Amino acid sequence: MLPFVHEQIGTIIVNFFILTVVCAITLVVCLAILTAIRLCVQCASGVNTLLFVPAFYIYNTGRNAYFKFQENRPPFPPEDWV
């Protein structure tokens, strides 16, 4: 075999190896970014579940109780009681 054929085969093998390594590194970086985004979404969901949902429930319950008891107010005491 001619010597330049060995050089071309070696160059093809090295280029294929470099391309494979670059693709693997790109894949790992993309997976890391997607994992970080997923973690942020899970944290936001946890904050919503643990903080905002109970706050809305307490606010709505108190508001409904306030309006309910506004309609059923007891009468004022007579003036001679004061």
From Swiss-Prot:
Keyword entries, A-Z: Apoptosis, Host Golgi apparatus, Host membrane, Membrane, Transmembrane, Transmembrane helix
Main location: host cell
Mode of membrane association: Single-pass type III membrane protein
Record topology, Intravirion segments: 38-78
GO biological process: disruption of cellular anatomical structure in another organism; viral budding from Golgi membrane
Transmembrane segments: 17-37
Compartments it resides in: Host Golgi apparatus membrane
KW Hydrolase (keyword) present: no
Entries under Pfam families matching the protein: CoV_E
A cellular-component GO term for this protein: host cell Golgi membrane
Superkingdom of source: Viruses
Record's keyword annotation contains Transmembrane helix: yes
Function description: Plays a central role in virus morphogenesis and assembly. Acts as a viroporin and self-assembles in host membranes forming pentameric protein-lipid pores that allow ion transport. Also plays a role in the induction of apoptosis.
Homology family: Belongs to the betacoronaviruses E protein family.
Record-linked HAMAP family: BETA_CORONA_E
Name the UniProt record assigns to this protein: Envelope small membrane protein
Organism field: Bat coronavirus HKU4
Gene that this sequence comes from: E
